[in-house]
Amino acid sequence: MIPRYSRPEMVAIWEPESKFQIWLDIETYACEAQAELGVIPAEAVDAIREKGAFEVARIDEIELETKHDVIAFLTNVAEYVGEPARFIHQGMTSSDVLDTCLSVQLTRATDLLLAGMDRLLAALKTRAEEHKMTVCMGRSHGIHAEPTTFGV
């Protein structure tokens, strides 16, 4: 994103830190579900929840070796979690994480855009009411036409 054209709230949604946090949340939720089904031990989920962390620079470093973003992420998380990390990503594919993350990011971005549209529409309504009697030159097919008003 080009900083001068980007809203900080939108940039935050797409930053690597946010992406990897969503990945960690997805992996943790998957482990929680597997623990509820008795597939993995509940203690492992507790450890993953408590110790689960990552460092973007370290993930980038690992990815230079592995040439795989998800493997790099999982390797870095395992450095924090330890032995229970073997249950992370069990039964999942990279697409499970990437596609779910993208859906979360798109939902957050859409919510931000819709909130902005609501503010824009409110401002337009205010201006339309404010200028309902302000006369201006009408236009039709790119040329001057009958007078109209800026507002409603």
Enumerate the predicted regions with their spans.
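A helix-coil-helix interface module used to build multimeric assemblies
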Residues: 1-152
